[in-house]
Amino acid sequence: MFPESFQIYFSEHQNLLYLSTLVLDLGLTVLMFRFFGKEGLLACIVLSILLANLQGPKLTVIFSMQTSLGVIFYSSIFFATDLMSEKFGKKEADRAVMMGFSISVIILLMLSISLLFLPSIQGNQTFSTEVHQAFVTILDFTPRFIIGSLFSYLI
């Protein structure tokens, strides 16, 4: 998706990639609030919960510590919920987070149903099987992240 030079640079500068992604995520949250108000914050909260849960299984090393990529998006969840609470009240912020978790559960359910479909045996069977296995791998961890996130929020 990105030019090869871009990929090479950031593969050698993972800490800078982390900080850039964090600034981009928080910056987009601010822009969404500026352009769309409460609905923009709601969209950011839902999107960040989804991204945090889907990217949670991917581990990397940032500043010499192993970490999940999901942590990047938790910062914008906290930022957006704090902003929503400040501007629109705690009840609206709680409602937005619960909507995000509800959508995560719905997406997880629908993606899990997709795993019941067998990979195609027509055409490129190897590719179909590899894609199916990739879905299985990602979705195997996602319920744990959704449940853990929900419990940590409720506590």
Walk through the language-model features, giving the residues of each.
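C-terminal membrane-adjacent module
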Residues: 128-132, 149-155
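Hydrophobic transmembrane alpha-helices
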Residues: 1-84, 91
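Membrane-interface interhelical connector segments
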Residues: 114-143
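Alpha-helical transmembrane segments of multi-pass membrane proteins
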Residues: 49-53, 78, 82, 104-107, ...
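Transmembrane alpha-helix/helix-exit interface in multi-pass inner-membrane proteins
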Residues: 98, 102-124
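Short, highly charged low-complexity linear segments
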Residues: 58-59, 83-90, 113-119, 138-139
